[in-house]
Each structure stands twice: as structure tokens, then as C-alpha cells.
Amino acid sequence: MVVPKVGINGFGRIGRIVFRNAIEHEGVDIVAVNDPFIEVHYAAYMLKYDSTHGRFNGTVEFDGNTLIVNGKKIKFYAERDPAQIPWSETGAEYVVESTGVFTKQEKASLHLKGGAKKVIISAPSSDSPMFVMGVNNDQYTKDITVLSNASCTTNCLAPLAKVINDKFGIVEGLMTTVHSYTATQKVVDGPSNKDWRGGRTAAQNIIPSSTGAAKAVGKVIPSLNGKLTGMSMRVPTSNVSVVDLTARLEKAATYDEIKQAVKEASEGPLKGVLGYTEDDVVSSDLNGDPHSSIFDAKAGIALNSNFVKLVSWYDNEWGYSRRVIDLIAYIAQVDAQ
């Protein structure tokens, strides 16, 4: 098995959780990190302690411009310009672009100048191909140099939508994600010119917001293009979100038949990506769950045999970051063939 050497640009929430997942995963080798806004000793502290996911399970130290994690040395750079990051020094061929800034092809491809061969954007991209593991990763070809792992919400919705669409057909659907607050929101009311509601206190409000996650499913499942759209409700929880998909089906189905289809997929072709539970779970029970999507069999309802509401949980940090690593491991195997 090929173990790709990986660099991470941007050591924020996703960058650090991708790092933690990579250490657990063992299918990739993190060799370098770049972040111009934090120094190496602070990066070590932020990796070691996490309010949501707890202490790092291992040792974290630093020496000069090097992070030392479980005894392994990882080069730490502080370049603002992606083109200036010397990825080739460490042999990092696959770069996770997790700054949230360089989401377009032109900017993300600057990493190639420093020696990277592939760039994986950990956010939706308007002009780069998007891949969702378990849904359309088989469409990846070696000639693609910049790709997107889509969003955490698309990663939750797409596997569920795929199962339902393949088995029963989706005529149309509306999605609401009840989404934990994120770093872009405010601790207290503050200015937010583009999104006035988004400037209100995150921990005190339910905040309606927009999301392109449902429409993006149409990019990874072309047969659903134009059939899905959705919105978001930002709520006062720090992590774990839940998708509510209301869909009209082509083929009549009982709710039990839908449950069975999802359960079979979760144990078969989508194992590890799509989870299934009949337990009475609440959001904190899914903290640290590595699935993209965990179908809640008890939470959904059917109005009739063609109109259903389906509910699926996701750890919007941990599950998404695990898929970033899975995607890199997958494309590295394809590239090696």
C-alpha cells in the first residue's frame, strides 16, 4: 500500500482535526504544516489541547521550527504565499488546503509551485472538481491536480441521498441542517455586513443561515442536479450537526423499507461512511464519530409512502476530517497505478 506524504496548509479547526485523524488513520504520513499566523510552540499547544475533542492521545513537543508528535518530526512553516511553501523539502506530495481562503483553482494550485503534486481543498470549491467518499470518488482520475472534499454537510447528505435515490428515486427534496456554531460566528453581537443575522451571539441564538450543501449534492450525484436545495439553522452547540432531508419519492416505500435500505448500505458499500443507529441518541453522543453521516432510524417520519423526512447526524469536524484523509489515501492509490 502506498502511504502518501502529506502537508497541511492552515492549522485551524479542520487543519488540526485532519492532523489528529491522520495520526489515527496510519494510511497517510503528515510531514509538514504551514500556518503564518501561529508560532510552532503555540501550534503544539493547540494540537495538544482541544475543548471539543479532548487532549491529544500521545506526545506533542517542539524544537525550533519542528513539531515533534509521538517522537516523529514534522516541519512547521510560516509562509503567507502558498507558492512559497517549500513542500518538496519534506517530500509532501499531497497538500490539504484548510485555510478556508484559497478555495479556487487558481490560488490552490499555487501549492504546486512548491513541489506539491495534488491539492485537496477542505471546503467547497466553485471551480474545482468535488469528491464525496462513497458517492463519486470513483470518478477521480490521475490528471486532476486540485480537488475539493466538498463541505461537511454535503458529506452527510450525499451518501444518504445516494441510497434513497438509487433505491426509490428522489423527485425533489428540501434539506435543513441544524448546525453547530463555527469559528466564523460571534461570541457576542458584532458587525457582520454580509450576513446581519450571522453577527449575533452564537451561544444565545438559533440563527437561520444559507448553505450550498444541498445544491452541491447535484454536482456529485448528477441525476439529483436541480432537485435539492436547503438552508441552515446555526444553534448553540459547539460540535455535531444534523441533516433533516424532506423528500418526495418516485417509488412508493414504507418507512421500514427505507430503514432497511440505509442499514444494508451502511453494512455494505457505504460501510465507514454511512452509519446507522436505532438508539435514542442526542448530538453529544456523536462527538468524535468518524462516519460522514449517521442515519437516525427513530427520528425520521413518513407522511405517506411517497413523502418522507429523514434524519442523519454528523460530527462536522471529526467525520469530515476523516474523509479528507480517506480521500487522500484513495487518490494516492489511484495515482500509483
Swiss-Prot record:
PROSITE patterns, per database record: GAPDH
GO molecular function: glyceraldehyde-3-phosphate dehydrogenase (NAD+) (phosphorylating) activity; NAD binding; NADP binding
Active-site residues (renumbered): C152 (nucleophile)
Binding residue positions for NAD(+): R13, I14, D35, R80, N316
Keywords assigned: Cytoplasm, Glycolysis, NAD, Oxidoreductase
Catalytic activity annotation: D-glyceraldehyde 3-phosphate + phosphate + NAD(+) = (2R)-3-phospho-glyceroyl phosphate + NADH + H(+)
Binding site for D-glyceraldehyde 3-phosphate: S151, C152, T153, T182, T211, G212, R234
Pathway this chain belongs to: Carbohydrate degradation; glycolysis; pyruvate from D-glyceraldehyde 3-phosphate: step 1/5
Cellular localisation: Cytoplasm
This enzyme's EC code(s): 1.2.1.12
Predominant cellular place of this UniProt entry's protein: cytoplasm
Oligomeric form and interacting partners: Homotetramer.
Family (UniProt): Belongs to the glyceraldehyde-3-phosphate dehydrogenase family.
Protein's name in the database: Glyceraldehyde-3-phosphate dehydrogenase
Protein's organism: Monascus purpureus
Taxonomic path: Eukaryota, Fungi, Dikarya, Ascomycota, Pezizomycotina
